[in-house]
Structure formats: C-alpha cells, structure tokens
A protein has these predicted regions:
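Canonical Rossmann dinucleotide-binding motif of NAD(H)/NADP(H)-dependent dehydrogenases/reductases
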Residues: 1-29
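Conserved glycine-rich Rossmann-like NAD(P)H-binding loop of the short-chain dehydrogenase/reductase
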Residues: 24-40
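Conserved NAD(P)H cofactor-binding loop of Rossmann-fold oxidoreductase domains
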Residues: 86-91
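Substrate-binding pocket helix/loop in short-chain dehydrogenase/reductase
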Residues: 94-95, 99-104
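Active-site loop-to-helix junction immediately N-terminal to the catalytic Tyr of the SDR YXXXK motif
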Residues: 98, 142-150
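Active-site helix of classical SDR
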Residues: 118, 152
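Residue(s) in the substrate-gating loop at a strand-loop-helix junction
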Residues: 136
Length: 160
C-alpha cells in the first residue's frame, strides 16, 4: 500500500485523484478548506473500507501546512510515496479589481504551499518518491481577468 498526499482533495480534480488512489488500495491523506466536502469525501470512501484521511484547513496558512504535514508524517512512519499539489483557485485579475491581498493569497495557495509541503515531506519520501505539481496552459497564455491564477500556474510550472 502506497501513501499519497493530495492538496485540494475535496472537489473537482482533487476529489477524482483521492477517489482513484483510494480505489487502488492506497492510503490517501488530503487537505481542503471546505469542511463539509472533506467530511463527505472521507465518509463516503471510508464506508467502502478505503484508507482515506481528510484534513480541513487553508493551505495559504503556514501553520495549517505545518500541522497537516506533522499529522501525515506521524501517521505514516513507513513514508510517503507521492505528494500531489493540486490546490489552486481564481480570484480574478485586473479587470475585476483583484486586490493585492487576493493576488498574494492565490500565490500562497498555488505556489508557496506546494513549495513548503515539498520541503516538509522531503525526508519522508519512500525511495525516490514523487512530487506532482498540477499546472495549466494558463502558465503560458493568460486569459483576461485570470492574472492571479495565471501567475500561480506560471510559478508552479517554474518549481516543477
């Protein structure tokens, strides 16, 4: 059984990743800021006897990342096989008046959190381990009013 860690795992692509890896018999630890969605995914998959462990928190907050990583490391002495940095969000851009704070928030979720989680888990990977950073074509071509998201995807691409 492998141990997989996923950010943004309660909805969308992240939820599909959680469901897929859990269905393969892997232990999946995921984090998302939507408490209800975390509970729904965790309960649904645990009812099917899958090893899924949901954590509610905002990955833009360094303390949340520290606590999440500490929990995963404590509960997985055998190590981690894969970290999937999936979480990101849109807060608009220039046209919609995306504030400076909102722009920076998107960068913390989409770039800074993956960096810190990679650093926190660095010595806990099994064998060579894997870090998968999800990017987007937006990293190479922006679309109007998506500048915060585009910058985050450019940043995660540069980290990969």
């Amino acid at each position: 059984m492998r141990t997989i860690v996923i950010t943004g795992g309660a909805k969308g692509i992240g939820r599909c990743l959680v469901e897929y890896f859990a269905s393969q018999g892997d232990a999946v630890y995921f984090i998302d800021m939507d408490a209800d969605a975390v509970a729904t995914v965790t309960e649904k998959l645990c009812a099917k006897q899958m090893n899924v462990y949901g954590f509610t928190g905002d990955i833009a907050d360094e303390q949340v990342l520290q606590k999440f990583a500490a929990r995963v490391i404590e509960e997985t002495p055998q190590g981690i096989h894969c970290l999937i940095n999936n979480a990101c969000l849109m807060k608009g851009g220039v046209l919609s008046g995306c504030s400076y704070d909102d722009f920076l928030y998107v960068q913390r979720v989409g770039v800074a959190a993956p960096y810190l989680l990679s650093k926190l888990f660095m010595h806990h990977f099994v064998g060579v381990g894997s870090i998968v950073n999800l990017s987007s074509t937006r990293a190479f071509q922006s679309q109007s009013d998506t500048e915060a998201y585009t910058a985050a995807k450019g940043g995660i691409t540069a980290l990969t």
